[in-house]
Design a protein with these regions (language model features):
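Acidic catalytic loop of the alpha/beta-hydrolase fold
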Residues: 69-74, 102-103
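Catalytic active-site module of serine/aspartate enzymes centered on a nucleophile-bearing elbow/loop
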Residues: 106-128
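Short alpha-helix in the alpha/beta-hydrolase fold that links the catalytic acid
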Residues: 52, 61, 75-84
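Short beta-strand/loop motif that positions the catalytic acidic residue
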Residues: 58-60, 65-67, 71
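Hydrophobic/aromatic beta-strand patches that form the interior of the parallel beta-sheet core
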Residues: 6, 64-66, 94
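Hydrolase active-site cap/lid region
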Residues: 1-46, 54, 61
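Short, well-ordered secondary-structure micro-motifs
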Residues: 17-18, 76-77, 106
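Catalytic histidine neighborhood in serine/cysteine hydrolases
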Residues: 80-104, 109, 115
Length: 128
């Protein structure tokens, strides 16, 4: 009985973040099929079979996405894209300027706390 989704610095899909990490490590993206095969064989998981971006298209519950615009690990554009594709009528995107990965609450604690608190209150107690 999930009533809402809140994600801080979420990536859009395993495939997208793996390819980004390969590039960041100066490894050829052509290695992706090998990484995928390793995930399938050893983790029993296919990175191409799932993604938050496509799952959110069918989402009908409240969604809060938070991201620092200076995140160098998970690009902020991934949250922007998930927000754009999200099918929920109750969706919110908080972008925190100058915040790195997982640091939005440190950079703008008051705004972060208010946004998350309001979301939780609204989601858990929709009648007011």
């Amino acid at each position: 009985n999930v009533v809402g989704i809140a994600a801080d610095c979420g990536y859009s899909s395993p495939r997208a973040i793996i390819r980004k990490v390969l590039k960041d490590r100066h490894l050829p993206v052509a290695l992706y099929p090998l990484v995928r095969l390793g995930a399938i064989l050893f983790a029993h998981f296919d990175p191409d079979s799932v993604g938050a971006d496509t799952a959110l298209e069918r989402c009908r519950i409240p969604v809060l996405l938070v991201h620092g615009d200076d995140d160098r690990f998970v690009p902020c554009d991934m949250s922007r894209e998930m927000y754009r594709r999200c099918g929920s009528k109750d969706k919110e995107l908080l972008i925190v300027p100058t915040a790195g990965h997982g640091a939005s609450y440190l950079v703008d604690y008051d705004r972060y706390r208010k946004t998350v608190s309001d979301f939780v209150r609204r989601t858990l107690h929709p009648e007011g």
